[in-house]
Every structure is written in structure tokens, then in C-alpha cells.
């Protein structure tokens, strides 16, 4: 079944619910009358709700309408491409060196236009110290404030604590000429206080 918009003589129904060029509701009229009104206004009769009974048609400039629809579709695709979510996983007792490394990855992701989900992973008795996670997330949010903002505040998620950071508008454009892709930094990063993934001491 074709989804192409029907215009003018391609609208083959006996009557339509007509909307005028200014958005005014004209009412149900014969198709011949609707076509005549559109022609007198040097505009097009466009079927905007074909599944209604009777179909809804609007008098408009169809060329301009097609252009606006295409613009909205492009904007929608652009927005979808910008909703990539990266993830950084940290332990609540992270040392300063590893924190700076992870922070730099978060900054790069934000500059690239990606959102970042930051997850604090608690183990064992660490679960009784949620304030450690809150402090770490608050610190990170403040440290990257020039590159993004806290979209979803810190919250407990089972044994973990999460926060979502979003880039400032235009971040990807500003950063494209300054930074290449982060070498070796994937979508998920997991470190503990020593920089090891298993929590064992050096």
C-alpha cells in the first residue's frame, strides 16, 4: 500500500473535511469544491489524514510542505545519532591517578556528543557507605561541568549507583577539530582503587 501523500486530482474521494490555508476549519465539502477553493488561492489541496472518515485535506503550498517535512526528518535523524550512551564504571575508593584517567575519558565522550552513564560499583561492606558514591559522582559532575551537565542525578540501582551526564549543545562540533577518538577507550570502562579490574592490590 502506497504511503505517498495524495495531492489535488490524485485525491479520489467524494468529499473531504477541509482545513483552510490559515488553519481554519471549513468543514465537510465536496472534493470538487475543495479543489476549486485551492486553485482560486493558487495553492494545493493536500490530504493530511487519509485514514479519517472523510479524509482530512488542507489547502497549502505543497512544495513548501515537503521541504519542511524533509527538514524535520533530517533533524530527527541527527538527534537520534547524537543519543549514543557510553558508560564508565568506577569503584567508590578510586585513587587520584585513575580518577583523572577516567575523567579524561568522560570528557572525550561528552566532547564527541555522547551521553555518559557513570556507574559506581559497590562490593561487600562498601554497600553500607553509599555516601562515597554520592561524593564521587558529585565531584565528577562538577569537574566536567565545562563539557556536560548532570541529566539524571545520582541514584541507587541495586548494588550500584548511577548518574547520567549529557553533553552541552554543539559539543561534537566544537571538539571535532581538537581530539581524535580516545585510544583504547571502549563504551564500558571498569576500574577500582588501584586501577585493576579485580580489586587486587599491586
Swiss-Prot record:
PROSITE patterns: IF3 (PS00938). Coiled coil: none annotated. It comes from Mycobacterium leprae (strain TN). Belongs to the IF-3 family. Residues 172-202 are annotated as: Disordered. It holds the Pfam family IF3_C. It is found in: Cytoplasm. The keyword Cytoplasm applies. GO terms for molecular function: ribosome binding; translation initiation factor activity. Monomer. This is Translation initiation factor IF-3.
Amino acid at each position: 500500500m502506497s504511503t505517498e501523500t495524495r495531492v489535488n486530482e490524485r485525491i479520489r474521494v467524494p468529499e473531504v473535511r477541509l482545513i483552510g490555508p490559515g488553519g481554519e476549519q471549513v468543514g465537510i465539502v465536496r472534493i470538487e469544491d475543495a479543489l476549486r477553493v485551492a486553485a482560486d488561492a493558487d495553492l494545493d489541496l493536500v490530504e493530511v489524514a487519509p485514514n479519517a472518515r472523510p479524509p482530512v485535506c488542507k489547502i497549502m503550498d505543497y512544495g513548501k510542505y515537503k521541504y519542511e517535512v524533509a527538514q524535520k526528518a533530517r533533524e530527527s535523524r541527527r538527534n537520534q545519532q547524537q543519543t549514543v550512551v557510553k558508560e564508565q564504571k568506577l569503584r567508590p575508593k578510586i585513587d587520584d591517578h585513575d580518577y583523572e584517567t577516567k575523567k579524561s575519558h568522560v570528557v572525550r565522550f561528552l566532547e564527541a556528543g555522547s551521553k555518559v552513564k557513570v556507574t559506581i560499583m559497590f562490593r561487600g561492606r562498601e554497600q553500607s557507605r553509599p555516601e562515597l558514591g554520592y561524593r564521587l559522582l558529585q565531584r565528577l559532575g562538577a569537574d566536567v561541568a565545562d563539557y556536560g551537565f548532570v541529566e539524571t542525578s545520582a541514584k541507587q540501582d541495586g548494588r550500584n549507583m548511577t548518574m547520567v551526564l549529557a553533553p552541552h549543545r554543539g559539543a561534537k562540533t566544537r571538539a571535532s577539530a581538537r581530539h581524535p577518538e580516545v585510544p583504547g577507550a571502549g563504551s564500558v570502562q571498569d576500574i577500582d582503587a588501584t586501577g585493576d579490574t579485580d580489586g587486587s592490590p599491586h
